[in-house]
Amino acid sequence: MRTLTIFFISLFSLPLVLNAQSVDEMLQKVSAAIEAGQNGQAVSYFRQTIALNIDRTEMYYWTNVDKNSEISSKLATELALAYKENRNYDKAYLFYKELLQKTPNNVDCLEACAEMQVCRGQEKDALRMYEKILQLEADNLAANIFLGNYYYLTAEQEKKKLETDYKKLSSPTKMQYARYRDGLSKL
């Protein structure tokens, strides 16, 4: 029984050891491809490494990748997409912000960053980003949908508050009714 237990423990721990070695090997391949100028191959290896261990891949990005190189934005995009797919919106937002520092008027990056802000519950920041997107590209569908929904829901909440406050009055005067109607017309 004891040998059987040892056998199973060693059998199940073997993939962890192999995984650690393969992540290091893949990261070495990424470095070699970057040094050789094979950016497409480097991104492919990087994507495979993300699938193996996203945390070590992120550490590699922060420690080994030159942030001024052209490939750094491609690698940051891969990490942002992976974190978004894993629903780690804070880290995805971090990498989209990293991309925005390089190209602050890139509509795609702004849109992805605003989407992450919505997922993180930061609607006010997302609102500002979507407004900036509309300044850059007036017919952006995602920005128009978000802003339309946001302003509509805000107006609905204000209308509900006005109606609730008006209904609290047992016998409203003409002046109170006029204020109520004026408040509704402003919405």
Model-predicted regions and their roles:
Residues 18-74:
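N-terminal leader/linker segments that initiate helical-solenoid repeat arrays
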Residues 61-64, 74, 78, 112, ...:
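Canonical tetratricopeptide repeat
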Residues 54, 70, 104, 138-139:
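Short coil turns that delineate tetratricopeptide repeat
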Residues 51, 98-101, 131-135:
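Conserved structural position within tetratricopeptide repeats
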Residues 57-70, 153-187:
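Short coil/linker segments at helix-helix boundaries
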